[in-house]
Amino acid sequence: CKVVDFAASRKTAALAEQLIDETLGDPGVVEVGSDDAGRWTIGLREVPRDGSDTGLALNSDSVFVVTGAAGSIVSAIVADLAAASGATFHLLDLAAKPAANDPDIALFVSDRDALKRNIFERIKAGGERATPAMVDRELASIERAEAALSAIQAIERAGGNAHYHSVDLTNSDAVTTVMSEILANHDRIDVLVHAAGVEISHMLADKPREQFDLVFDVKSSAWHSIMRAIGDKPLGAAVVFSSVAGRFGNGGQTDYSAANDFLTKCVMSFSNARPETRGLAIDWTAWGGIGMATRGSIPTMMAAAGIDMLPPQVGIPVVRRELTEGPIATEIVVGGRLGVLTAEWDEAGGLDVGAIDMGDEHGPMLGRVVGMSLAKGLTVETELDPEAQAFLYDHRIDGTPVLPGVMGLEAFAELATLLLPEHHVESIDNAQFLAPFKFYRNEPRKLRVTAQFAGVD
């Protein structure tokens, strides 16, 4: 499957031809954009933070609106934002506003096993047969109440103002009412953090329609309701919580993946539709220590898939840093090793390498194409023989043939031209000569050269 995005002005005939080309080739790419400047796709690259403070100034005058505030991860992030700003926070969640003196919350913090026993006995006392699933549901409700209370208390400790709104985010009228109340008291919203989400994993064929709608609407309908309510009022930044499931897809999470990707595309549109608002989508990997992914067999499954769980101390400051240190990109992936999510499904990147005719019009440094992928780029392999190539036979160190540095540069130039035949090489910059490539005993050696596209923001 592929998604192909064309400019609205593209003529139908050319569009049809390109769609056919996309169907027949380049199976390693699933998202493609096409305009007059060329063909574009999306890849991953690591971008270090520079620690600058060119982003938003968060202070006691700042106004935050946060959805999904009763989630343990969101609660921890709110606490971090509050400590850095002392701002005003409007917290939205389906969970009822927690009472500071709730004994269940206190017991959840001090002795979770004792709380489970209490819940079990309460269910029995009500005349029902207590099951582990019933206990876990009640415990999850108390856990969300504790997370909401923790967020409120963290804001208050930082000298900020916490306003908690219990609201069904899939109810457009209810969300509009809450947002109208918020906007009646403030002339702007500095930061919207849309972090609400529900994840119910089932294969699409086995998933009831109402379940799909719930998972999708918590993110999408809530977003529409909130943005309609904000209208043309100032909004400094909108941060949406997406997932690696939204970026890469995941089995049994079609609805969750689609909803997350929808939010990402919404904030990406801000560059044209709302340029005064900074949009940021964070594709989180699974968190370790807190959150939904810590339960049951999920950590074991993640390890088997080669996916690192995100340590809370690494993940919690991300939102604050992205807001205050200025934009690097509209969409970022936060995680460690991503395992199967970024694995190459075809060793050659979908190319029929045996059918590629390199022709005779190339230099001595290109042999045969080995493969092509987003992660590794275009790779060629060539065999060099000191007995056949004079530039090796005549270039020796202590009698051993050594690949001349200039021929290494020639390999780069030849491969770049193969990758982009409509361009020419103008210069080679930042070359480093780290170690000699030697041909011991005058024997042939195989050389692999890889070319990757430079990232474009």
Model-predicted regions and their roles:
Residues 9-242, 297-316:
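NAD(P)H/NAD(P)+-dependent Rossmann-fold oxidoreductase cores
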Residues 88, 272-279, 417-425:
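Phosphate-handling active-site elements
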Residues 73, 77-81, 215, 226, ...:
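Structural preference for long, well-ordered alpha-helical segments in enzyme cores
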Residues 258-259:
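Active-site helix of classical SDR
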Residues 195, 235-242, 292-294, 378-394:
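Active-site-adjacent bridging/hinge elements
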Residues 1-19, 96-100, 200-201, 243-255, ...:
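Flexible, glycine-rich beta-alpha linker
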Residues 15-27, 309-457:
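Acyl-thioester-processing domains in fatty-acid/polyketide/NRPS systems
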